Amino acid sequence: MEYRRGDLLCQFIFWILWMIIKKLLNSHRVYGKSAAMPDKRDIAPQKQKWMMCLVLAVVTLALFWQVNQHDFINLDDPIYIHENHHIRSEISLENVYWAFSTKYAGVWYPLTWLSLMLDHQLYGLNAGGYHITNLVLHILSTLLLFWLLNRMTGSLWRSAFVAALFALHPLHVETVTWISKRKDVLSTFFWMLTLCLYVYYTEKPVIRRYIAVLVS
């Protein structure tokens, strides 16, 4: 059952990639004369942007895919997962309350605990699934960084270069491949998301966009 759940996540990842490909195929539509002209942040054609997202995702996935065969390690993983009965039990209001109210192993990481609970529901103690979750979060952060830089500068290739450097830099290997570093990939994801939403807010400062920034 644990391997079955891991297979489902892999299928979900490739489904996302397939949706990106479909978006590329449909991005050639011709706009009428009344369509709004893109501003300087939309210099690169949409097809190129989606293609770059696809390339970044596939390259990062290919580089780190082997982590799905890796196991837990003895540094922090046993304390965080094996010896933590809250992680190894079902997600419940009691466990959610514990995640937000308790300082465990000397740290307070409520979102990390919740994400590990969800992993345990999906994969049990199949370490590969936990590693893949880290990888998916890292890929999403990479794509958000690319969107952010391209939106701010309008420069496709420079934005892609910086995003690729972020995705593939050796300093990030530990973060992606060590399950106990879930806190890092989670915080990076929400940081990138917050920056993207803030840029979105500055383009049209309305209250709902500002609330989205605060929530993220």
Explain the meaning of each model-derived region:
Residues W15-I16, I20-S216:
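Polytopic membrane enzymes that build or remodel cell-surface glycoconjugates and lipids
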